[in-house]
Regions:
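Conserved SAM-binding loop
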Residues: 1-108, 130-132, 205-209
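A conserved catalytic-core signature of glycosyltransferases
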Residues: 53, 121, 126, 200-202
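A SAM-dependent methyltransferase catalytic signature shared across enzymes that methylate proteins
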Residues: 129-146, 208
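Short, hinge-like loop/turn segments at secondary-structure boundaries
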Residues: 36-38, 113-116, 160-164
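Acceptor-substrate binding/catalytic loop of class I
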Residues: 113-130, 146-149
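A C-terminal cap/extension of S-adenosyl-L-methionine-dependent methyltransferases
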Residues: 44, 110, 147-209
Length: 209
């Protein structure tokens, strides 16, 4: 992806080795250029691997934290991804999984065929209880759960109703939402926190191996 989660981690951590994986050579090259500035600022080191998340070239039981954010809904055999994330995670360490929440995602599918048929887009909608059973199969212990980004639900539903086209209002809203994710803007945070429990765009699962 565009590396926003790596950037967010980089702002919060120091002296850490942060690894990103993407199957696109173009994306990896772009990220290598973008992250050179972050390396100097935070004394973090970054490594970018070209590869498939269903077969990760990282040693078993080697990672202190694994983040798999908004990935499982894109891949045909998502269980292979979960198994790989589990394999590389150190015992006792934490895995963060996030997927689109059922309600807002269902509305986007309902309102827009284009949303459903986007190349490389979402091919399934997860239900919370189903995913919890998948985690149990791997003996991952769920210790925290919440929903986030309710305002992103608003953005994507409005865009779905607009045949996936971005008008000026939606463009401005999206720019502000991205800034908010990095703490650079404050958009009705109180309202969003009130909406998150039932309308958050992402469901976040915190799991321990």
């Amino acid at each position: 992806g565009n590396g926003r989660h790596l950037k967010s981690l980089g702002f919060r951590l120091t002296n850490a080795k942060i690894i990103g994986i993407d199957q696109s050579i173009e994306e990896i090259t772009k990220l290598q250029n973008e992250f050179s500035e972050h390396i100097c600022k935070n004394q973090n080191s970054y490594e970018f691997l070209i590869g498939d998340v269903r077969s990760i070239e990282i040693e078993d039981n080697s990672q202190d934290l694994v983040i798999c954010s908004e990935v499982l809904e894109h891949v045909p055999n998502f269980r292979d991804v979960l198994k790989e994330c589990y394999r590389i995670l150190k015992p006792g360490s934490v895995m963060l999984i996030s997927v689109p929440s059922y309600l807002p995602e269902s509305l986007c599918w309902k309102y827009s065929k284009e949303y459903m048929q986007t190349p490389g887009g979402h091919i399934r909608i997860f239900k919370k209880e189903f995913l919890k059973e998948c985690f149990k199969e791997l003996d991952l212990k769920l210790f925290k759960y919440h929903r986030e980004h309710a305002m992103h639900s608003v953005y994507w539903i409005l865009r779905a109703r607009n045949n996936m086209q971005e008008n000026e209002f939606l463009k401005s809203l999206h720019e502000l939402l991205v800034k908010q994710m990095f703490g650079q803007a404050n958009i009705s945070l109180f309202i969003e926190k009130m909406l998150n429990p039932f309308f958050g765009k992402s469901e976040c699962f915190y799991l321990r191996k």
